[in-house]
Amino acid sequence: MTSLVYFSSASENTHRFVQKLGVPATRIPLHDRAGTFEVDEPYVLILPTYGGGITATGRDTSYVPKQVIRFLNNTHNRSLIRGVIAAGNTNFGESYCYAGNVISQKCRVPYLYRFELMGTAEDVVAVLDGLEQFMESEQWHRQSQTQPRLGV
């Protein structure tokens, strides 16, 4: 099975979804202010979407948790991302799972799937099947590209 890296806030919704997958996964620490957490193999990132909104500078990065931004601003970590899966809440309308769009565009990787809150049994099956197919694809084996920093 593919390598998964995920972030889950204190609500643990994303963590519970990853547990349901039943595959090894590495969690981005909730408190890693130094930004020293690194991975050593290609991975698919699973992350929740935060509320979002336009910042004073006009940049819209608040959908992505700050811990994930720090993790991906590490050039080594960013070079190993191969795809993204996002969690969200449909109550947020157009912002539903928007963190996946941001990461996909900024890191130039496919947006593989989105699910609500902790996901359903159908989401688990879809993600496991999709990851298996993705691992066999050319995109999984691609060389890293030069990618811009996410910004804060």
From Swiss-Prot:
Entry-linked HAMAP family: NrdI
Free-text function comment from the UniProt entry: Probably involved in ribonucleotide reductase function.
GO molecular function, a single term: FMN binding
PANTHER family with a match to the protein in the record: PROTEIN NRDI
Similarity remark: Belongs to the NrdI family.
Gene3D superfamilies in alphabetical order: 3.40.50.360
Organism the protein comes from: Rhodococcus opacus (strain B4)
InterPro entries named among the record's database cross-references: Flavoprotein-like_sf, RNR_Ib_NrdI_bac, RNR_NrdI
GO BP term, example: protein modification process
Protein name per the record: Protein NrdI
SUPFAM superfamilies: Flavoproteins (SSF52218)
A Pfam family annotated for this UniProt entry: Flavodoxin_NdrI
